[in-house]
Design a protein with these regions (language model features):
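Hydrophobic membrane-insertion alpha-helices, especially the h-region
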Residues: 8-25
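Serine-esterase "nucleophile elbow" of acetyl-processing enzymes
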Residues: 28-92, 112-113
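Structural recognition of the beta-strand scaffold that forms the well-ordered cores
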Residues: 49-52, 87-92, 119-124, 172-177, ...
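Surface-exposed cleft-lining segments at the edges of enzyme active sites
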Residues: 93-99, 130, 137-152, 184-192
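Oxyanion-hole/transition-state-stabilizing segment in secreted/luminal serine hydrolases
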Residues: 103-148
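Short, flexible, mixed-charge acidic loops at enzyme active sites
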Residues: 127, 131-140, 227-243
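Substrate-gating cap/lid alpha-helix
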Residues: 181-220
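Histidine-centered active-site loop/cap adjacent to the catalytic His
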Residues: 240-256
């Protein structure tokens, strides 16, 4: 298996388990080395430049362990599980919308250099765009309210991808889908899952326009919680999700 396929498989694996208790660095057994000390000095460790770009999920908000969320765990796993010598840069900023991420990609010289050097990139985007629409139209929300904003978001996502490819034409990009924590903050929005599904469909359809750009869905893992129970119900008086950060009921916690 070549490096590209290994990287692709590993990214999908860890991001799919992003919000479950089966963190790979705890459950994947590590085979004991059969190399002698002399042999190990002869093995050149392959290098990998991992770039994480996005919003609070990339920054690691909600991870009370202080490790930095899924991106840091993924970077560590490249080393621990596959022996890569990893260069890891994290450009996640909490609250960033797609417009703000694109602006940073144009204006941040450090990010521009990181894009040129990266071997693989993850992107978390879209959740704050959706939240902005909810807050702006809160008194008059309908599923159709999100149609135009979703399309506009999709166009901005394409601009982000094109910007990354301008700097690095063959860069594999993994775009993480959004999930539905809104039933905890806005339990009256019972159609919110339909909106989140549509938002993810928009993201996935845009990624399919590019070779080497992949959509990674995470909604089912987060929306249903640790026990796999549906998050939205008629009785919204007591709703909880043990994969979300208790302080805001929005971001994944360290288990998530």
């Amino acid at each position: 298996m070549n490096n590209r396929k290994i990287i692709q498989a590993l990214v999908f694996f860890f991001l799919s388990l992003l919000l479950s208790i089966f963190l790979a660095n705890l459950v994947i057994p590590k085979a004991s080395s059969k190399l002698t000390a002399e042999d190990s000095t002869k093995v050149e460790q392959p290098s990998l430049y991992y770039l994480a770009v996005g919003d609070s999920l990339t920054e690691g908000v909600g991870d009370t362990t202080g490790q930095g969320g899924f991106a840091t765990l993924l970077a560590n796993s490249f080393t621990n599980e596959f022996g890569y010598q990893v260069t890891y840069r994290n450009f996640g900023i909490s609250g960033n919308t797609s417009s703000q991420i694109f602006k940073r990609m144009k204006e941040d010289s450090d990010l521009a250099e990181a894009l040129k050097d990266a071997d693989v990139m993850t992107l978390t985007v879209g959740g704050n765009d959706l939240r902005k629409v909810i807050l702006k139209n809160f008194t008059n929300l309908d599923v159709s309210t999100f149609d135009k904003p979703a399309t506009e978001y999709g166009k901005r996502l394409e601009k982000i991808i094109r910007r990354a490819r301008e700097k690095n034409p063959n860069l594999p990009i993994y775009v993480i889908g959004i999930y539905n924590p809104f039933y905890l903050n806005f339990p009256e929005l019972t159609d919110m899952q339909l909106v989140v599904d549509k938002w993810n469909q928009e993201t996935e359809s845009r990624t399919r326009k590019f070779s080497g750009v992949y959509f990674v869905p995470i909604n089912d893992l987060l929306y249903k919680g640790l026990e796999g129970e549906q998050g939205v119900s008629v009785n919204t008086s007591k709703i909880a999700n043990n994969l979300l950060y208790g302080e805001d009921s929005f971001h994944p916690n360290n288990t998530g």
